């Protein structure tokens, strides 16, 4: 049987994908993987430089290939770049992963809570200019896609990565037992089962 991530995290910039992946990996004693880091390793330069020097289409090609490989090879916690879900082939790959029993968690966050985390700096090339307005526009475009690919939705507003990790664990337990978490804060299960 091929490797498959224990969980895949998706969400906008500032939702905490990388830090939550680290927290979950630590709790579960698993490896963590971030597809943005994979893209940077292949390209030999930071994401921001790829956007400037090679353009967004090239970045998206590299990103999709990184997601495809990670879904096939990685058996730990996988964090996808914020825009990875926009690629139709990535959506198909995530659907196949879910159909095989995989769990995709949409880490939802409001602009109020994302802003301090993101810092709206040069390392976020899609947010340059008026970063708050651009972030809001990204979410308007991406929210339906995040929701469509997700098995579970967990809000990260006002809580740290350890609490988010606990809520993800509770949501995964809910999926196994079919019972809601005792604390009621595990997250929303979006599976159709």
Describe the residue ranges of each PLM region.
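NTP-dependent small-molecule kinase module
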Residues: 1-3, 27, 103, 133, ...
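ATP-dependent small-molecule kinase phosphotransfer cores
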Residues: 34-95, 124, 132, 136
């Amino acid at each position: 049987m091929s490797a498959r991530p224990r969980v895949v995290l998706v969400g906008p910039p500032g939702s905490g994908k990388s830090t939550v992946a680290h927290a979950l990996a630590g709790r579960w004693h698993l490896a963590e993987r971030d597809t943005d880091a994979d893209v940077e390793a292949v390209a030999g330069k930071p994401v921001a430089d790829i956007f400037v020097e090679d353009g967004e289409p090239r970045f998206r090609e590299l990103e999709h290939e990184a997601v495809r490989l990670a879904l096939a090879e990685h058996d730990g916690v996988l964090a996808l770049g914020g825009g990875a879900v926009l690629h139709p082939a990535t959506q198909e790959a995530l659907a196949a992963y879910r159909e095989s029993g995989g769990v995709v968690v949409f880490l939802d966050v409001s602009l109020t809570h994302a802003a301090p985390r993101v810092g709206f700096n040069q390392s976020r090339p899609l947010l340059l200019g008026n970063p708050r307005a651009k972030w809001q526009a990204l979410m308007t475009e991406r929210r339906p896609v995040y929701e469509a690919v997700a098995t579970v939705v967990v809000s990260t507003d006002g809580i740290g990565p350890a609490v988010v990790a606990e809520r993800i664990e509770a949501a995964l337990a809910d999926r196994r037992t079919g019972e809601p978490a005792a604390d009621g804060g595990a997250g929303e299960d979006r599976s159709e089962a």
